[in-house]
Amino acid sequence: MDILKSEILRKRQLVEDRNLLVENKKYFKRSELARKEEEAYYERCGYKIQPKEDDQKPLTSSNPVLELELAEEKLPMTLSRQEVIRRLRERGEPIRLFGETDYDAFQRLRKIEILTPEVNKGLRNDLKAALDKIDQQYLNEIVGGQEPGEEDTQNDLKVHEENTTIEELEALGESLGKGDDHKDMDIITKFLKFLLGVWAKELNAREDYVKRSVQGKLNSATQKQTESYLRPLFRKLRKRNLPADIKESITDIIKFMLQREYVKANDAYLQMAIGNAPWPIGVTMVGIHARTGREKIFSKHVAHVLNDETQRKYIQGLKRLMTICQKHFPTDPSKCVEYNAL
């Protein structure tokens, strides 16, 4: 009994020492006791407790909506009405609310872009963007006007001048796949840019009314899209960091194209793009134990077209250049893919 009384007395003395009980109150919060004990522990250990300044900060620093409402009168309208409509439609928002002005719609778009950033930017329609760019070029020509007799070249596609011929490239192709990776990458880059230039020259040589037709604009947009798709591949080739398995497959494709063996080039392309296992790698790990197919998955059996969007794009661009190469540098029908299909 004496032990219990002494323990009660010790607890009461501890509460009095911590100054937890306020006047006219017979209870205290346990969180306050824990905080006092923590402060006493830090003092014994020699730590300095810094006062919290959370209460001194204004509420506007953590409220972006309030900040936008305070600053919206100061921001001028920096986008055209057409651009505001396009961005609102991309996000599935109405282009105008009831009683809303153009400036109000611009402010609403600005709030949406800040509060809900765009997460599916990689899923844009690249072909439509290229078509819009070509339409804008023709519109600029109409607005700017053109003198009679002036040569219409401002809407022509950009041509990569490689200062080489197909005969020189065919001679270089004899050394492909001989073990010199840097030389192989240089030949691949030169040949692909040569094909892009051949394609652009063909499109630039069309009549003006053909360029302005729907099919003509589509062909020009396809060439622009292919060029943009191949930029990551050219960057990897220039920096010498192209994956070894893809580099080996592209080397085989280019070698067969220079030999005008288009059927073999198409087989090598399918081997690279789809492989012998056209499914993701996780399929072999469905059960508790790995299946036997797991042992057979290596570089030639992986579907590279499924890896990421960038690889899918430049693999698709490579296939388009294979078609252009077959069209401009034909061979025997038995060595062609879909002969006269273009």
UniProtKB/Swiss-Prot annotation:
It comes from the Eukaryota. Keywords: Acetylation, mRNA processing, mRNA splicing, Nucleus, Spliceosome. It holds the Pfam family Prp18. The modification N-acetylmethionine is found at residue 1. Its main location: nucleus. The keyword Lipoprotein does not apply. GO terms for cellular component: nuclear speck; spliceosomal complex. InterPro entries: Prp18, PRP4-like, PRP4-like_sf, PRPF18. SMART domains: SFM (SM00500). It is found in: Nucleus speckle. GO terms for biological process: mRNA processing; RNA splicing. Heterodimer with PPIH. Interacts with PRPF4 and with the spliceosome. Part of a complex containing U4/U6 snRNPs. PANTHER family: PRE-MRNA SPLICING FACTOR-RELATED, PRE-MRNA-SPLICING FACTOR 18. Belongs to the PRP18 family. Participates in the second step of pre-mRNA splicing. This is Pre-mRNA-splicing factor 18. It comes from Mus musculus.
